[in-house]
């Protein structure tokens, strides 16, 4: 049947289409485009049933033309309605395929799954970490119970929060080439053994022919081994030349148990040992006693040239070991996460403040400090300001600004004088404040003032919150009493001498008592031996023992009596000394406004006038 002819098939007229025109019509028909209804399934169904493009027209229907295809494309009829049209083929295979395609087309597309955030994605790569046992050097026995749980504390700190390690390109390259390098070095060792065996052939007591045969055999093996070495070298270069991501995120797994440290052999190669144990890094520690303080050093080792061993050191008292381990673990976590050094810039007010960073004083606050992310303790203090101590967290970023603003203490100008208006030096600790009467500026700080010279002193302190608001005030301190000071010194000396005499008398009484007990036991044994039948001859010295026992009894009684008397004497003098100390304790004084002082002065003068008149 030629193109353009009609035929009678299935009781209707069918207009055949040339294959070339069929391909054009498949492209032009909108059902075959991938943009129809936004589904690839519809396009596949339309392409699957491309014979349906040769639509069976009725006898009166005109032949399809390009204009009809263009109008059909403008209408965009759905593919499901086309498949369900009566003009579709009636073959059973096409009917089954038509039903399946209709089901595919009727199924709505699945909603797009939201992409998870990178922070919530669990990395596929694993970076395994182990903690070995710590070593102790020079730790006294009294402090060993403090340092024993150091490794357990570090293990707990590392297990608290999840860790992510970023594998750099250099680290990935070295880890990929590590097994090939091990094979390369193994081949080198095997070649060295073969060369050594070849050299020792000349020492064997064999014939020259056998020696040449053995040497040739070893030479052949050495050449084969050199070929293997060259292949291993090529494999190492190939592994290092591979493409790696600039940064690959890996999840850190802390292996082992709290009470089970990672066991290390006596001699080992770190990179090979870690690869055999399927580990990525190893943490070791060392604790050293330094003049009563403990110095803790942690080492993070990977065995790779791209990742050198990093050391973290901190020192402090033994009782602060948990705090030290907490700080070191924070620094270790930052190193595990491949944190870059942080440049810390200080912005401290007042400028003359003293700042210590993790217990280490910072000499120049105008210069930046280089540190690593983690938790640190900062202490700031300045004269005339409230001190501040705070734990800060430095994030993983290039620069960190530490801004500190100390709160100034309230300053008050007061006039200092004594109750009897006499002149006496005033000391605050070892610092001389002035000689009364004088004016000075004091802060709302509870400090003890010493009034008077060394021979006659009194003590006082200012109660907090007692300064008049924005008013000039006068601080009246108690005048020194020479008699009270001398009496206090005398009672102190007497109490010290009483205690010294008691310390001498008590050991003497104890020694005499023990000697008396030994003498009584010896005398009893001698009497028991003399009372046994038949009576043996009386041992010599029994009378001497009795006289010695009597003398010791008298001496012990006297010593015990003296010790009791001295004990009572010490108790009495200690009580008198404590009573004098209580009377000479620092007195609380309150600053008074100048108008109150003037009123009191006028009142005292009026009372004196009344007394004179009377």
Swiss-Prot record:
Keywords: Cell membrane, Membrane, Transmembrane, Transmembrane helix. The keyword Aminoacyl-tRNA synthetase does not apply. Residues 591-605 have a biased composition (Basic and acidic residues). The keyword Cell membrane applies. Residues 588-614 are annotated as: Disordered. It is a multi-pass membrane protein. GO terms for cellular component: plasma membrane. It is found in: Cell membrane. The chain crosses the membrane at residues 494-516, 552-574. It comes from the Bacteria. This is Uncharacterized protein TP_0577. It comes from Treponema pallidum (strain Nichols).
